[in-house]
């Protein structure tokens, strides 16, 4: 159903190759694929357009996009306030940041940010596909919230082909239900950032 894929901080051509045929099929039917990434990745090269902000400025870009949508499109603020928490505080945060600061932080021209925001708003339905790179900076969780809020502002939440996606890692849930009654030892964990050395250092469970 999606008519626009906003691929933000994600390189599915390398990390999610199973996703690319679906995106290519949608593009063949007229959908757009736009990549937001500081790096000109393989996915960006295969997309309709790439937007390349300064590393770590994704939250500022999301605020700039929100400012553009609020200024140039009929955002349904009363409806959003009724179905969300702290929307007034969010609007205050967006309003408090001057667009000039957004431009300075992201190293992007105003025209690019406004084009990205209004293309995302106008193309229906649109989905945001976020990657895990966005969380590798200070205020990473807040950055995800700012990006998710764009889906609410544009009205892409709760519609087929819309939404804001972040990869779900299922194994923390699975370990609670798989053969739980046959456990003889507590579950072990290995840091993802040191997966190879961590696995090499493990021993057989007792």
Sequence positions of predicted segments:
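Cofactor-pocket helix-loop regions in the catalytic cores of large enzyme subunits
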Residues: 1-159, 164, 168-171, 180-206
């Amino acid at each position: 159903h999606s008519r626009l894929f906003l691929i933000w901080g994600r390189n599915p051509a390398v990390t999610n190759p199973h996703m690319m045929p679906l995106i290519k099929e949608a593009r063949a039917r007229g959908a757009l694929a736009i990549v937001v990434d500081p790096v000109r990745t393989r996915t960006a090269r295969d997309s309709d357009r790439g937007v390349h902000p300064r590393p770590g400025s994704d939250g500022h870009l999301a605020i700039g996009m929100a400012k553009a949508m609020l200024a140039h499109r009929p955002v349904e603020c009363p409806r959003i306030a009724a179905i969300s928490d702290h929307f007034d505080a969010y609007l205050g945060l967006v309003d408090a940041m001057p667009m000039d600061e957004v431009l300075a932080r992201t190293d992007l021209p105003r025209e690019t940010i406004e084009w990205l925001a209004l293309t995302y708003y106008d193309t229906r339905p649109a989905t945001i596909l976020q990657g895990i790179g966005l969380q590798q900076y200070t205020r990473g969780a807040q950055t995800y919230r700012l990006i998710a809020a764009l889906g609410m502002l544009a009205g892409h939440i709760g519609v087929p082909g819309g939404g804001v996606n972040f990869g779900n890692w299922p194994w923390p849930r699975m370990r609670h239900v798989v053969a739980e009654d046959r456990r003889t030892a507590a579950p072990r964990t290995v840091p993802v950032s040191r997966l190879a050395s961590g696995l090499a250092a493990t021993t057989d469970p007792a």
